[in-house]
Curated annotation (Swiss-Prot):
The lineage of its organism: Bacteria, Bacillati, Bacillota, Bacilli, Lactobacillales. It comes from Streptococcus equi subsp. zooepidemicus (strain H70). Belongs to the HrcA family. The gene is hrcA. This is Heat-inducible transcription repressor HrcA. GO terms for biological process: negative regulation of DNA-templated transcription. Signal peptide: none annotated.
Length: 344
């Protein structure tokens, strides 16, 4: 455990270093700490011995280590003030007409990346917590059709497919009937289970050749089990991390899993400093903020950046964007669930 003065010294070094990215010496702290330069140097040496500070190669000053940043986040981090220009730009960015949920999620991800200069990712409600509330098949021609799936009565998913060659005219209706009878209204995990257990038995009753029918079921429904994730600012990872992290950002399902694992069920926000079990994220900071998607559940907004980021500003920005996002989604879903009449 460190003393109050040592904690103040660490906090000041973190603040100064994240602003200048230059090592901090005892003289720079003397006017901010009511102690002699020798006492400050002593405390800095103790903090270094504890692994919270480290020496710079080109200076006698000290800079925070990954452990030092982590200690700061866990014990001293509080929200900083938002620059008025930043706030104006954020509010202005959310003043647009959204035609679908993805428009809002993508805008939030882009704004977080643009204002921080780092990588941002945003996730919809976890697939396992969604329900299949609608299903239809629209035949486009004699050879292809479009499956329209609806999740949580508001999120559509379309899948175009070639009609199997051995299908008769009634077979699409039979397939639609099976879905309506066995899968509609069920949560996605139950749908997944039934596709593996119950549906193959049902299909045998209605189809002579079942292999291509089961393949078609898999093809139509596979999208239900994928995370909806938008990532902005991927190229920035080359500046603060490296090629491995940059390449990992393209593996969106793995990234989504890492983000979900960073936050427990009870937490509304977390800051993970060089502490991810995923090797590609092991040396970066991951900030995650949980936001409400009305009538459906919670989404996650994440910021991925360097360990030496400006935490006060970054945490404040993700909080403000999260709040603006919640307001925008509330208005969007209120409109979807209202009676809409155009009066001329």
């Amino acid at each position: 455990m460190i003393t109050e003065r040592q904690s103040n010294i660490l906090n000041l070094i973190v603040d100064l270093f994240t602003q200048t990215h230059e090592p901090v010496g005892s003289k720079a702290l003397q006017s901010l700490i009511a102690s002699s330069s020798a006492t400050i140097r002593n405390d800095m040496a103790k903090l270094e011995k504890l692994g919270l500070l480290e020496k710079a190669h080109t200076s006698s000053g000290r800079m925070p280590s990954a452990a030092g940043f982590k200690y700061f986040v866990e014990h001293s981090l509080n929200l900083g003030s938002i620059d008025e220009q930043d706030l104006y730009q954020l509010v202005k960015a959310f003043d647009f007409e959204a035609f679908k949920l993805e428009d809002v999620l993508l805008r939030a991800s882009q704004m977080l990346s643009d204002t921080t200069g780092y990588t941002a990712a945003i996730l919809d409600v976890e697939p396992a917590r969604q329900r299949l509330t609608g299903f239809d098949i629209v035949q486009l021609s004699s050879h292809d059709a479009l499956a329209v799936l609806t999740l949580d009565e508001s999120k559509p998913l379309t899948v175009q497919f070639a009609i199997p060659k051995n299908f008769m005219n009634r077979d699409l209706l039979v397939l639609k009937g099976i879905v309506a009878d066995r899968l509609l209204g069920k949560d996605v995990m139950t749908v997944h289970y039934k596709l593996r257990t119950e549906i193959p038995q049902i299909v045998q009753k209605y189809f002579t050749v079942t292999d291509n029918v089961l393949d078609l079921f898999d093809y139509i429904f596979v999208g239900l089990f994928r995370e909806t994730i938008f990532v902005s600012g991927k190229v920035a990872a080359l500046d603060y991390a490296g090629l491995a992290t940059y390449q990992f950002l393209d593996e969106e399902q793995r990234l989504a899993l890492s983000i979900r694992q960073s936050l427990s069920e009870e937490e509304m926000a977390t800051v993970q400093v060089a502490d991810s079990s995923e090797p590609a994220l092991a040396n970066v900071t991951l900030l995650t903020y949980k936001f409400l998607i009305p009538y459906r559940g919670f989404g996650l907004l994440s910021l991925i950046g360097p360990v030496d980021m400006d935490y006060r500003r970054s945490v404040s920005l993700i909080n403000v964007i999260g709040q603006l996002l919640a307001v925008k989604l509330r208005d969007y879903y209120r409109y979807l669930n209202s009676n809409h009449y155009e009066v001329h």
